[in-house]
Amino acid sequence: MTENSTSTPAAKPKRAKASKKSTDHPKYSDMIVAAIQAEKNRAGSSRQSIQKYIKSHYKVGENADSQIKLSIKRLVTTGVLKQTKGVGASGSFRLAKSDEPKRSVAFKKTKKEVKKVATPKKAAKPKKAASKAPSKKPKATPVKKAKKKPAATPKKTKKPKTVKAKPVKASKPKKTKPVKPKAKSSAKRTGKKK
């Protein structure tokens, strides 16, 4: 019972005010929404075009311009309309319901594109660094760097080993040659003593 008693007195003064101003047209918010839907501009409809539509289709009083400005601001603050251009009541306006799904899809596409573009850039940098030293294998950069260092060191050590080995082999036969005649002379001496 309390809900009905509070709602009925609030509705009566609204009807009285509307009847005094004009009973031939609906609410300004409804007329503005109808004007935007009728124009169907992708860029949005301006306040002047909304005023022309309302004046041509509805019987509006002299204060229609000021009422349209106020109602446009209210619709923008409540979220029914979205302002695409301009500030305040000036500029172009769209219905928020039709724009929300389109914009959300557009933002998702741009995020995916940014991620795709960022990944090849990161992969391209290590390829350039790897291609400078070994041109054959430009794929796994961290593994290559570890392999390059040990591969370079044994090459340096092999060269001095080959140089040292040659004089050692040549010196061995020289030492063995003078040993043989000494053994022969000792054998001759033993034969003479007998």
Swiss-Prot record:
Biased composition (Low complexity): 1-11
Record-listed N-acetylmethionine modification sites: 1
CDD domains, per database record: H15 (cd00073)
Keywords: Acetylation, ADP-ribosylation, Chromosome, Citrullination, DNA-binding, Nucleus
Similarity field: Belongs to the histone H1/H5 family.
Major subcellular location class: nucleus
SMART domains: H15 (SM00526)
Phylogenetic lineage: Eukaryota, Metazoa, Chordata, Craniata, Vertebrata
GO BP terms: chromosome condensation; negative regulation of DNA recombination; nucleosome assembly
Name this polypeptide is given: Histone H1.0
Modified residues (ADP-ribosylserine): 104
Entry PTM: ADP-ribosylated on Ser-104 in response to DNA damage.
Domain H15 per the UniProt entry, residue ranges: 24-97
